[in-house]
């Protein structure tokens, strides 16, 4: 991938960086509305003097490789639509924590906190972290497995729904 625009779209912010000639640019953060998503990408691409042929979008939501329906916004990101409207060779969509899993090997060891010392029997990894929701991804036998685990109803939430208490200020679920 020669030149690419990299996007991380969360429930609150959009972050972007450019990958130009094997160099990652400074990451910028901004708040945008759903309706401004494609115009914002178009503006970013037009501001660059280099030709940008690739777009990588990481977003919170189920990814079928063609589109992502965000779990925390009223937005569906469609790869083919972005390729056409932004005149791109390729748009790659990733679940947000799938993107984190891809970046894991780029992090320095000092970025990690060891909770319990031990001798791992393999390199399988479970990644969990907060964002707009709870992000979860797995790496099993060097294969990245994105999940929507953070969007699964807990038994407590289900019980509150069943008893019609989910809207009550007296009860909440963690």
What residues fall within each predicted segment?
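Glycine-rich phosphate-binding loop signature in dinucleotide/nucleotide-binding domains
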Residues: 47-51, 119-122
């Amino acid at each position: 991938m020669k030149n690419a625009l990299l996007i991380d779209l969360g429930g609150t912010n959009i972050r972007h960086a450019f990958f130009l000639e094997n160099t990652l640019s400074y990451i910028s953060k901004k708040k945008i509305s759903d309706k401004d998503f494609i115009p914002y990408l178009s503006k970013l691409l037009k501001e660059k003097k280099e030709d940008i042929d690739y777009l990588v979008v990481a977003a919170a939501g189920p990814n079928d490789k063609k589109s992502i329906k965000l779990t925390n916004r009223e937005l569906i990101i469609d790869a083919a639509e972005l390729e056409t409207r932004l005149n791109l060779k390729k748009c790659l969509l990733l679940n947000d924590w799938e993107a984190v899993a891809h970046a894991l090997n780029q992090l320095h060891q000092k970025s990690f906190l060891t909770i319990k010392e031990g001798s791992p029997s393999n390199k399988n990894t479970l990644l969990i972290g907060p964002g707009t929701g709870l992000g979860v991804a797995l790496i099993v036998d060097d294969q990245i497995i994105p999940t929507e685990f953070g969007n699964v109803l807990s038994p407590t939430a289900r019980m509150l729904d069943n008893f019609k208490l989910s809207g009550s200020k007296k009860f909440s679920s963690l």
